[in-house]
Amino acid sequence: MKCIVGLGNIGKRFELTRHNIGFEVIDYILKKHNFSLDKQKFKGAYTIERLNGDKVLFIEPMTMMNLSGEAVGPLMDYYNVEVEDLIVLYDDLDLSQGQIRLRQKGSAGGHNGMKSIIKHLGTDQFKRIRIGVGRPTNGMSVPDYVLQKFSKEEMITMDKVIEHSAHAVEAFIESSRFDHVMNQYNGEVN
């Protein structure tokens, strides 16, 4: 079974913020396929669905971002999901808006949600999709920036990025060759 995790913070006030882009991609996929996160366990909202014949566990942690591993680790254990079948979607300050970067593995890169998942899984050897949100300009602090909603102009780009990221997730589900998925989806989204 594949496991797709989108990172974000729970609550209405965080919807459409930069830090919640992982949730936005999960929500896009669920809506597209008429699925919903209809179960809760281990601090996570989740569903198990069939997509293109494959069983898929979709998770949105119901913790704050920095505690995401408290939901992901126990749910993966409960459903016996192997770490090589996991992909995590999250915001990345080091990529400009409009870019996504798929990786086979890697460090948390300063992202506290990823730090928590790595801690709870005991490894950083899992796939991820880093979704560029850019860095703050005009002296805004990083916490204020990532918790700020996208502007209408930014959402024009981010809607394309969300769709592109969702296609990358679907390709991951269908393919046994993640290197091919990376080659197809890495880069600037137009």
UniProtKB/Swiss-Prot annotation:
Active-site residues, record numbering mapped to chain: 19 (proton acceptor)
Principal subcellular localization: cytoplasm
Site feature Discriminates between blocked and unblocked aminoacyl-tRNA, where: 9
Keywords from the UniProt entry: Cytoplasm, Hydrolase, RNA-binding, tRNA-binding
Compartments it resides in: Cytoplasm
A single GO BP: protein quality control for misfolded or incompletely synthesized proteins
GO molecular function, one term: tRNA binding
Reaction equations catalysed: an N-acyl-L-alpha-aminoacyl-tRNA + H2O = an N-acyl-L-amino acid + a tRNA + H(+)
SUPFAM superfamilies linked to this entry: Peptidyl-tRNA hydrolase-like
UniProt-annotated site: Stabilizes the basic form of H active site to accept a proton, residues: 91
Binding sites annotated in the UniProt record for tRNA: 14, 64, 66, 112
Any one GO cellular component localisation term in the record: cytoplasm
EC number: 3.1.1.29
UniProt record similarity statement: Belongs to the PTH family.
PANTHER family with a match to the protein in the record: PEPTIDYL-TRNA HYDROLASE (PTHR17224:SF1)
Function of the molecule: Hydrolyzes ribosome-free peptidyl-tRNAs (with 1 or more amino acids incorporated), which drop off the ribosome during protein synthesis, or as a result of ribosome stalling. Catalyzes the release of premature peptidyl moieties from peptidyl-tRNA molecules trapped in stalled 50S ribosomal subunits, and thus maintains levels of free tRNAs and 50S ribosomes.
Binding partners and assembly: Monomer.
Record's protein name: Peptidyl-tRNA hydrolase
Source organism of this protein record: Staphylococcus haemolyticus (strain JCSC1435)
Lineage per the UniProt record: Bacteria, Bacillati, Bacillota, Bacilli, Bacillales
